[in-house]
Amino acid sequence: RSIRTSYTHTILASYLGYITQAVVNNFAPLLFLTFRSQMGLTLEQITLLTTLNFSIQLLVDFLSVKVVDRIGYRPCVVAAHLFSAAGLSALAFLPQLLGNAYAGLMLAVTLYAMGGGLIEVLVSPIVEACPTDKKEAAMSLLHSFYCWGHVAVVLVSTAFFQLAGIGNWRIIACLWAALPLVNALYFSQVPIRRVVDPQRQLSVRSLFGQKLFWLLLLMMVCAGAAEQGMSQWASVFAESGLGVSKTIGDLAGPCGFAL
């Protein structure tokens, strides 16, 4: 079937979108101790990178409520992947180009966090709107791709570090940036249906007036913070706290958590 008419391609692009989000959230944490040794960062500065990533994604989630409906799902999801690609590429180059390594890292994190936040709010509704059979199975499989993407990030990156050396981490950062670039092109071609009829859509004021919304929001923030804390700091703890090698730390920490 044609890529422009088959919703199977839409679902596949969405799966790759969640893998992209896994790269955005979980690649840099594998390098926290490398950033510390190469760039002279403190643990407090590294912690702020994690906080910045999480906070910007939350902010983008809130701001996208109205923006997405006005602009459209396709341009927004394509832009999300371009932001992700730009951030991952910037991770490799900006710390050196700016002369201030920490400022470069923060700008890179800001870029890919914007992409990750948009992907988070766009991909599920896009799949939900696809006129396909077994939608429940497709949605369940969709959300599992974040975990499989997390595993892939750790395994592929660890294999690269073993073969090429941790000092060449900028190369694999650029290689990971190719994934969202390719998927941006993919999303520009696949069919995307409107998720909700505008006449039936709740206004932001109505949504904010529901107590259940605030309860679910609190649960999501707490769950997201816990997940980010575990996935992003497990490698550092295993390597520096337990004294194991980086390879064992990455496999036992973030990879084990993802599984």
Kindly give the residue locations of the regions a language model identified.
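Primarily marks hydrophobic transmembrane alpha-helices of the MFS/SLC 12-helix fold
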Residues: 74-77, 105
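Extracytoplasmic gate region of multi-pass secondary transporters
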Residues: 28-30, 210-258
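C-terminal ends and interior cores of transmembrane alpha-helices
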Residues: 82-99
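Helix-loop-helix hairpin linking two adjacent transmembrane segments in secondary transporters
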Residues: 133-134, 141-192
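Central cavity-lining transmembrane alpha-helices of secondary-active solute carriers
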Residues: 48-66, 254-259
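Extracytoplasmic
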Residues: 9-43, 124, 230-235
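Cytoplasmic helix-loop-helix junction between adjacent transmembrane helices
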Residues: 108-144
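Juxtamembrane cytosolic amphipathic helices that cap and anchor the N-termini
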Residues: 3-16, 101, 206-219, 223
